[in-house]
């Protein structure tokens, strides 16, 4: 039986880590795509990861390419293409150059992957999701941004470290845009079932909320470029959304998607999880 195809647009840090995670979990065969000037990078990473499979025991096929024909027919497409942030830059500073890139990707997806479920990672994320949906004409439920999973994970981690508890004991969710407008929902956050506001002082909670909003920028300052381990894991989590049925048990996961003129966070079951951005 043929495996499902998952195409990754962009073979940089996030794209490479995505390919590794997907292959190890054998979620499908992977096509790692990049522009012709970076085809060697895509092919080299693909070959390295296939050899890694022989060591670790996974059997996913990984193909590096710069040919859109190899992307065709993918069930899932994850887009990481674009220029990453540098120290001192906001996500919005990337708008001009990455908008041109996302438009080119969108035109090719219309031709080669008209039925794909598309997950956007490129920044500024909410604008990229909107532009890709607009250019492709795909249904809003078929084009999502992974930001909510990543932002919620950062919020969850910072709370766990503050309270010295296991990350899995914290329930936290971040809604809104992937940037300064994100809203860590403290009123619905719990630690072992106890509302976080009963456990964390208001000033400390406020500092954690602010650190969550600046979580990506903190890493950019330290590394000189954007994060990629956690964003890749968040995007892999998002691949489950296209596989879950409306009745299957599922964890609610926030994402960025567009319906008409409104940006909505949606759950992994496809139901609206919260209202528009603040």
In which residue ranges do the predicted regions lie?
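Glycine-rich Rossmann-fold phosphate-binding loop(s) that bind the pyrophosphate
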Residues: 11-12
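N-terminal Rossmann-fold NAD(P) dinucleotide-binding loop
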Residues: 15-16
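Aromatic pocket-lining residues of Rossmann-like dinucleotide-binding sites
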Residues: 22
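Conserved N-terminal Rossmann-fold NAD(P) cofactor-binding segment
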Residues: 33-74
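Rossmann-fold dinucleotide-binding core
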Residues: 81, 117-197
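Rossmann-fold NAD(P)-binding glycine/threonine-rich loop
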Residues: 87-139
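NAD(P)-dependent Rossmann-like dehydrogenase/reductase catalytic/cofactor-binding core
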Residues: 167-278
């Amino acid at each position: 039986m043929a495996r499902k195809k998952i195409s990754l647009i962009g073979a940089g840090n996030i794209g490479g880590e995505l390919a590794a995670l997907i292959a190890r979990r054998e979620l499908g065969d992977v096509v790692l795509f990049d522009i012709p000037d970076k085809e060697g990078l895509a092919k080299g990473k693909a070959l390295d990861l296939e050899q890694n499979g022989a060591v670790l025991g996974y059997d996913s096929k990984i193909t590096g390419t710069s040919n859109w024909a190899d992307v065709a027919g993918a069930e899932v497409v994850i887009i990481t293409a674009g220029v990453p942030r540098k120290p001192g830059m906001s996500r919005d500073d990337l708008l001009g150059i990455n908008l041109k890139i996302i438009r080119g990707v969108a035109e090719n997806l219309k031709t080669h992957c008209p039925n794909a479920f598309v997950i956007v990672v490129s920044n500024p994320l909410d604008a990229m999701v909107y532009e890709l949906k607009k250019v492709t004409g795909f249904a809003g439920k078929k084009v999502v941004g992974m930001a909510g999973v990543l932002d919620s994970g950062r919020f969850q981690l910072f709370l766990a470290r503050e309270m010295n508890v296991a990350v899995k004991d914290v329930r936290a969710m971040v809604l809104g845009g992937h940037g300064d407008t994100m809203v860590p929902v403290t009123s619905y956050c719990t630690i072992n079932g106890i509302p976080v506001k009963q456990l964390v002082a208001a000033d400390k909670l406020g500092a954690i909320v602010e650190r969550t909003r600046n979580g990506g920028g903190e890493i950019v300052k330290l590394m000189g470029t954007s994060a990629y381990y956690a964003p890749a894991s968040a995007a892999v989590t998002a691949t489950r959304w296209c596989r879950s049925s409306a009745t299957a048990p599922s964890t609610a996961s926030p994402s960025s998607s567009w319906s008409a003129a409104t940006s909505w966070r949606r759950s992994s079951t496809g139901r609206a999880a919260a209202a528009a951005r603040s």
